[in-house]
Amino acid sequence: MNRRTLLKLLALTPLAPSAREYTQSQQPHILVVGAGLIGASIAYHLSFAGAKVTVIDKQGPASHASLGTFGWINASYAKQPQHYHSLSQQSVEAWHQLQKQLNIPVKWGGSLEWFSDEARQQKLIRQIVEQQNWGEPAGIISAAQASSLEPHVDFTGASNIAFSENDGAVDPVLATRILLQASTSMGAQLIYPSELSDTLYDGTRLVAAKTTTGRIMADKIVLATGAATDIVKKIAKIDIPQRS
């Protein structure tokens, strides 16, 4: 199973319910492994819901996959099939909410795409029509219209350019740090460098995690380790091969 297939399967499941307050007796202690953008978002939303949260990372915030990501927020034609595209649409909306909550600087300017190969260009046009049928505000514009949006780009020879107006861009490292800062302000603990090495159980109940910085009590563990799938296989016994 590759990363994109995994995301498609996740798209078939409902999104997490709205945040709710835990009572003191209910408050779980959750260990989030990985302080990248995904781990930081998980930590923020769990902290907001009232959970006790600890985040660990073997190097530091946004030091691996999140450091190299393009930062493109989109529900583009490449998000196939439709349930995966729907998940991406919800993700775009979630970024708008995060921006309001935490003042994360997101640039909402849309995106432009086109191909020099005529056959691929015709396929792009069909894909944009499909996007429109799925409720995405995307369309085909001329080179002149594209030049008005991006005057410093040479669109000579280009035609039928795809414009996805809902797309945005974010600095993933900055967004990660803002999310973690918000989490720690609500009581979350951030520890690095610290690496998960094993888990401890009382029968079938998880009670703690062994890390390179010591034992951490935990009721639940969330693995947000990006491309480092070896730890997922070791701890969760799930093999997630990666491909680029």
Predicted regions and their residues:
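N-terminal secretory signal peptides and thylakoid transit peptides that target proteins
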Residues: M1-T13
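A short, basic/flexible loop-to-alpha-helix module at the beginning of a structural domain
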Residues: L15-Q26
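Helical element adjacent to the flavin cofactor pocket in flavoenzyme catalytic cores
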Residues: N166-T212, D219
